[in-house]
UniProtKB/Swiss-Prot annotation:
Domain tr-type G: from-to ranges: 17-208
Protein name stated in the entry: Elongation factor Tu 1
Chief place of localization: cytoplasm
Organism: Wolbachia sp. subsp. Brugia malayi (strain TRS)
Assigned protein family: Belongs to the TRAFAC class translation factor GTPase superfamily. Classic translation factor GTPase family. EF-Tu/EF-1A subfamily.
Cellular component terms (Gene Ontology): cytoplasm
EC number, as in UniProt: 3.6.5.3
GO molecular function, one term: GTP binding
Subcellular location: Cytoplasm
Membrane-spanning ranges: none
Name of encoding gene: tuf1
Alphabetical list of HAMAP family matching this protein: EF_Tu_B
Amino acid sequence: MTTAVEATAQVVEAFGKPHVNVGTIGHVDHGKTTLTAAITKHYGNFVAYDQIDKAPEERKRGITIATAHVEYQTEKRHYAHVDCPGHADYVKNMIVGAAQMDAAILVVSGVDGPMPQTREHILLAKQVGVGYIVVYINKADVSDPDMIGLVEMEVRELLSKYGFPGDEVPVVIGSALKALEDDDGEYGKKSIDKLMERLDDYVEVPPRSVDLPFLLPIEDVFSISGRGTVVTGRIEKGEIKIGDEIEIIGLKATQKTTCTGVEMFKKLLEKGSAGLNVGILLRGTKREEVERGQVLAKPGTITPHRKFKAEVYILKKEEGGRHTPFFANYQPQFYLRTTDVTGSIKLLEGKEMVMPGDNVSIEVELQVPIAMDKGLRFAIREGGRTVGSGVVSEILEWV
């Protein structure tokens, strides 16, 4: 299956433009889906409101999420855009990363101003590493102009509170419904043009995975007589070629080695790059010194850790999750990249227990260290079934 990052390279080739993943966030009924429909009408292949609202369900890491995917383009860029019909779907999508966002369009009603889900989505966007937010104040055609000014101030304060540059964030004022109805006024189609301009100018194109430091999660290890130890896996990012120094990280003490060969389907390659399933031959490394769950990485680019903070979503009973709540010191398995590791959960102040269907911040202490950095996604499993999903929001101890 093609990942979003691999797809980026293909999209640039297909459209001849840089690619950015965006999504709409914000409180229920503030107009996220109407705005999505309006953007497609003027910048893509039109997708009607009810088609977006009846988004098909996808399964990702054992969790079912309803997400609508649309695409559109400006003169400068190609955008893939995700919109979720329900609040629970937003929360799950942002944590599970079914559709990763480089930037979010925060939709706020000019009539109501920021509401509880507005806050929750901003906080989640920060926790899961969404880099940029552009604001669209909607329903301006039926709002008091003074009220719109207050809403903008409030939104900027809220963004600053949660770690975004509230003073710099672009704010566009308009009416998604007017734009959908082809209104030529300031709040109609012109507001969509302005929003697209702000996205183009404010949001930076993320680096492609192939330009990042090399990382390969180890899936299997073989010993080939006369040649040495081969590890296999899919290159998550970067490139590797013969002669490159690499580190083996996680589960035990970090080891240094050198790549003496890159193979794919029994063919020798000059180099392996992001997205490819390869075998890497390691110099002087014994079969028993390497195992599934470790990673190969460019030296000094990733370190092993046991303690971290995470933002998690716990599945409901109907989603195949737990039937009962859990309490502090609950010890499930954490499936990180290619392996399960047992860990203990600490609940943050004021939280006595976690119910199925909850979205919470937790602290985790794993029994063994795993190569990780902020933004790593994982599944929470119990007896082989997925009971939750999460994303690392902060590393708590440095080995």
